[in-house]
A protein has these predicted regions:
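N-terminal signal-anchor/signal peptide hydrophobic helix marking the start
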Residues: 346-357
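Final/C-terminal transmembrane alpha-helix of multipass membrane proteins
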Residues: 26-30
Length: 441
């Protein structure tokens, strides 16, 4: 455990209180999403879609050739990851592996080792598929990384995952061991963590994956700053990210808040025309103008409160604890490790780490369609903002075709795949959006 002795008496926070707390925050999150998400992308809806998005047959064939191989590999990686997560968290295997780790006298260390082990298993079993996917990206001209650089990125992501997950579970264990209504405090802490992470991401995480340099003074920089000024958005700087060290894909985004806000442009994007750079940046300014990051962070924080509460309820489930081997039941049903508050014990016991990670991982996958539906609507609103700001629907459509061609994006992916994994409208939808916007003028 994380220091001290486990509190074994029944906490004041009963299961009923947790359900009420979950209901309140769950309803608040759903209402916030329902009322603030621009579900109607364009008044009157989109005009009929061109499935090929007006792209030439040669480009479509190149996209199909890449996607027909890369998508199955990506889906297989997701499937393997889900399977491993379920096996480790929902069978006794994970608990047995964790109990075999050294450091039982120092539970904080053992908990961190448990997190490192579970996440390492996930990385190792999916590594062949990830290598395959990287090889396909290289063959298609999408990836420019060396294998050494790619390996560093994999290890960096793993290290971040271990660090953040360990800190989170150490906090949960500490609260469960010391605080009566630990689940209440933990859920509020989860919401606060979302807020802190959103603020820290631009200055802590982004530099781990790219280097940034100020854009040289010139017509393009002046044009982008003027575009932001026309939009009423204060921008401190225009930066160029060395994305070409990893990819040929093009992109831009607006990062930071208030006086530290900056426009970030991939160096690969500079190979396009200034008009297309302006259009992509105009889209990103749309997110800022609509406070999408701030709004998403606040709703995400509310969702985290509800989600953490739900996790504590599931972690106390007799069925899940029995399946995970956490309750100490032998095959004949004898209970060697009972606790008056099963959820509290799931948090304190180091052997509960695989179960907690399984609940989080599987819940994230199940809720992905809802998260991505909101994301697509928000991205469509940013597209409309870019059209309003630039009044250039023809250039916008050309830019979308360029993005699809460069990034090898399927202009009309299967509906089920778009529903589950699509974070942005399809290329066909975005071009139809531009056509609908023009028709409405």
């Amino acid at each position: 455990m994380c220091g001290g002795s486990p509190v074994t008496e029944e906490g004041r926070g009963s299961a009923l209180e947790r359900w009420v707390w979950l209901l309140c925050w769950g309803v608040a999150t759903v209402l916030a999403l329902a009322l603030t998400t621009p579900w109607e992308w364009l008044p009157g809806g989109l005009p009929p879609l061109d499935a090929d998005a007006g792209m030439d047959p040669e480009t479509l064939e190149r996209i199909e050739d890449y996607r027909s191989r890369s998508v199955p590999v990506g889906l297989a990686s997701v499937a393997v990851s889900v399977l491993v997560t379920a096996v480790l968290g929902l069978t006794p295997l994970g608990a047995r592996l964790v109990r075999s780790l050294p450091g039982s006298r120092y539970r904080a260390v053992q908990r961190c080792l448990a997190v490192a082990l579970v996440l390492a298993i996930g990385v190792v079993v999916t590594l062949p598929l990830r290598v395959w996917g990287e090889r396909l990206a290289r063959d298609a001209g999408l990836s420019t990384q060396t294998w050494a650089s790619w390996a560093v990125d994999v290890l960096t992501s793993y290290g971040l995952g271990v660090t953040m997950t360990s800190l989170t579970l150490l906090t949960l264990a500490g609260l469960a061991a010391r605080v009566r209504r630990w689940w209440l405090v933990a859920s509020l802490a989860a919401g606060a963590l979302v807020l802190v992470a959103s603020l820290a991401y631009p200055v802590v995480i982004e530099p781990l994956y790219a280097s940034f340099t100020p854009m040289e003074a010139g017509p393009l920089r002046t044009s982008l700053l003027e575009l932001a000024a026309d939009d009423g958005i204060e921008v401190d700087e225009v930066l160029v990210a060395d994305a070409s060290q990893r990819t040929t894909a093009v992109n831009a985004y607006v990062s930071g808040f208030g006086p530290t806000r900056r426009i970030v442009v991939y160096d690969t994007l500079l190979e396009t025309t200034p008009e297309q750079v302006r259009l992509i940046v105009a889209h990103e300014l749309g997110h800022t103008a609509n406070d999408d990051v701030l709004r998403g962070t606040m709703i995400g924080a509310a969702g985290a409160v509800a989600g953490l509460t739900g996790l504590t309820l599931l972690a106390g489930s007799a069925v899940l604890r029995r399946r995970s081997g956490l309750d100490g039941r032998t095959p004949d049903g004898a209970n060697r490790d009972a606790r008056p508050d099963p959820a509290r014990h799931s948090m304190i016991a180091v052997a509960g780490v695989p179960l907690l990670l399984a609940i989080y991982g599987l819940s994230s996958l199940v809720t992905l369609p809802v998260v991505n539906a909101v994301s697509r609507a928000v991205e469509a609103r940013a597209d409309v903002h870019a059209l309003d700001l630039t009044a250039n629907p023809v250039g916008f459509a050309a830019m979308q075709r360029r993005l699809a061609s460069t990034n090898l994006n399927d202009p009309s992916p299967p509906q089920w795949r778009q529903l589950w994994f699509g974070t942005h409208p399809t290329t066909a939808q975005r071009i139809a959006l531009a056509e609908g916007w023009l028709a409405a003028q």
